[in-house]
């Protein structure tokens, strides 16, 4: 069965991206493939590429930064009210209360009750959840994650944060990737309705909810 390919592009594709598109369009159970304007290679998959399947799950296509996204909040202050002195104080507070890596054990926020009470699929992941998961809640991370202040066209002041599920998302990805079965072109997959696939989907949803809670925690500090 041929794969339907949809492209939303701002510039021509690189040869490396074209190779990935060709390979993934021929992978088992890939029915649809979409290419976004920011597409670029990232190992065995491309950031900015989306695949649609019916029976198989490819954890490598999701990656470890499960639930990565953006949140924004508007302040009551206007941009014109913020002086250089205010900015220095704001960024000093951000660097103090919103770590890049993890909180100190003594002052980290607790996991929301829903996340704490909802078990992950393996004791190894549960242990990680209550250690790194707690210590990294409300932290930014590295790479392309960011926290910035913005002023819109009406001079209103905003904060925007881009971050995801931190180390627990990576742990979930690595744990389940070991249970994948070989598929075409060195890709590894989980059968969606098999126990391993069901467990992965549940853990992935947990990580998505954690990522949203992580962004909310950061926004609460800013507010």
Regions found by a protein language model. Name each.
Residues 39-41, 54:
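Short polar/acidic secondary-structure junctions
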Residues 41-42, 69, 164-169:
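Short acidic, Gly/Ser-rich segments with clustered Asp/Glu that frequently serve as metal-coordination loops
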Residues 39, 46-48:
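Conserved beta-strand/loop block within the catalytic cores
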Residues 1-33, 47, 53-61, 66-154, ...:
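Glycine-rich, flexible loop motifs
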Residues 157-161:
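Histidine-centered acyl-transfer/condensation active-site motif
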């Amino acid at each position: 069965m041929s794969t339907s390919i949809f492209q939303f592009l701002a510039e021509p594709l690189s040869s490396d991206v074209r190779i990935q598109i060709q390979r993934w369009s021929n992978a088992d159970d890939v029915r649809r493939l979409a290419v976004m304007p920011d597409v670029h290679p990232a190992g065995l998959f491309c950031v900015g590429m989306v695949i649609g399947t019916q029976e198989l799950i490819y954890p490598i296509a999701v990656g470890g930064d499960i639930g990565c996204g953006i949140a924004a909040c508007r302040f009551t202050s206007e941009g014109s009210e913020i002086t250089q002195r205010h900015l220095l104080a704001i960024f000093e507070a951000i660097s103090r209360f919103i770590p890049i890596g993890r909180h100190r054990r003594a002052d980290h926020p607790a996991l929301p009750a829903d996340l704490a009470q909802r078990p992950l699929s393996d004791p190894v992941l549960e242990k990680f959840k209550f250690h790194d998961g707690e210590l990294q809640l409300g932290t930014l991370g590295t790479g392309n994650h960011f926290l910035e202040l913005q002023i819109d066209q009406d001079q209103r002041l905003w904060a925007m944060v881009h971050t995801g599920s931190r180390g627990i998302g990576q742990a979930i990805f690595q744990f389940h990737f070991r249970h994948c079965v070989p598929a075409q072109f060195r890709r590894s997959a989980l059968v969606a309705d098999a126990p391993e696939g069901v467990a992965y989907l549940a853990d992935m949803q947990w990580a998505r909810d954690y990522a949203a809670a992580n962004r909310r925690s950061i926004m609460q500090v800013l507010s």
